[in-house]
């Protein structure tokens, strides 16, 4: 999986994420930051092409995996990486919950890691 520019995982956006859901799949509304990322990543041509809702695995479903691997490229995600690793575990940055998983690995490029690297 990946981490979104707004700290989402799957389509669990900050305004919609819940750590205690019972369902494993749900329909969710996508915020404009998440929708714009779909354009930035080349998935859609324009913002108006991106659906406003999507189906997503919930956070409990993602966290139930034995191993979690996240690939997080580009400097556009540097702030989200910082919030994930250094901020509080909170639905304000859904990816922060990955810190509570017993076997989660993040693969970052230099640009995505730029706000957590100390030189």
Regions found by a protein language model. Give the residues of each.
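Conserved phosphate- and dinucleotide-binding cores of soluble alpha/beta proteins
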Residues: 1-119
